[in-house]
């Protein structure tokens, strides 16, 4: 999926954070945004994944303007692991990861065997399958981050937005994450790993 930003501008309290940012990422392209703390990297990503609406400019997913799409439509195309995840879920790990399947469901549609298979595969990918029945709130910060990544993988989108995804991860799991997205194997989450 191609993600395009055109002339994105965002300001807070009379301070211009983003000034005319334009970029394009092509299908299956791995893109990194670098810069010092406070330079607007997360602000740009929040515009891309709909948390912020830019003061000016637009974001396009495969040529379609993001804010003209329904939230469900954009969630079928793009999953997000945000920099800060403040969740106090009283759900099991498996239930949290199942939330990633929501964009593919009709209202009140029940989870099926395929959903559980996708969730189990996502948990295995992030090495959290042994925690499937644990309550999310009992996990460490790094374990929670891996569950949120599994939820994004279970969403099975063609784009995955990661904002400082190694936050809270120990070095072993930082390396695992980097290998997951830089290995020569297909990164299409719709294919089995």
Roles of regions detected by a PLM:
Residues 34-36:
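The feature captures the beta-strand-to-loop junction immediately N-terminal to the Walker
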Residues 49:
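Helix-to-loop junction immediately C-terminal to a conserved catalytic motif
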Residues 57-65, 74:
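Conserved ABC transporter NBD signature motif
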Residues 98, 113-131, 156:
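Conserved ABC ATPase "signature" region
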Residues 109-110, 135-139, 143:
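Conserved ABC ATPase signature
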Residues 160-164:
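Catalytic Walker B motif of ABC-type/P-loop ATPase nucleotide-binding domains
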């Amino acid at each position: 999926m191609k993600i395009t930003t055109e002339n994105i501008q965002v300001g807070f309290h009379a301070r211009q954070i983003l000034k005319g940012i334009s970029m394009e990422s092509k299908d299956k392209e791995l893109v990194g945004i670098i810069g010092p703390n406070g330079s607007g990297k997360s602000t740009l990503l929040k515009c891309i994944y709909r948390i912020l609406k830019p003061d000016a400019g637009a974001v396009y997913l495969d040529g379609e303007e993001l804010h003209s799409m329904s939230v469900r439509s954009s969630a079928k195309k793009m999953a997000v692991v945000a920099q800060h995840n403040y969740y106090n879920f009283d759900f099991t790990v498996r239930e949290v990861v199942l939330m990633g399947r929501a964009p593919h469901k009709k209202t009140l549609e029940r989870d099926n065997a395929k959903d559980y298979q996708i969730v189990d595969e996502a948990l295995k990918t992030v090495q959290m399958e042994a925690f499937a029945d644990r309550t999310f709130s009992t996990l460490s910060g790094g374990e929670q981050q891996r569950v949120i990544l599994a939820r994004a993988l279970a969403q099975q989108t063609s784009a995955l937005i990661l904002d400082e995804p190694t936050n809270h991860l120990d070095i072993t799991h930082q390396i695992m994450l980097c290998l997951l997205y830089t290995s020569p194997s297909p990164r299409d989450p719709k294919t089995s790993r």
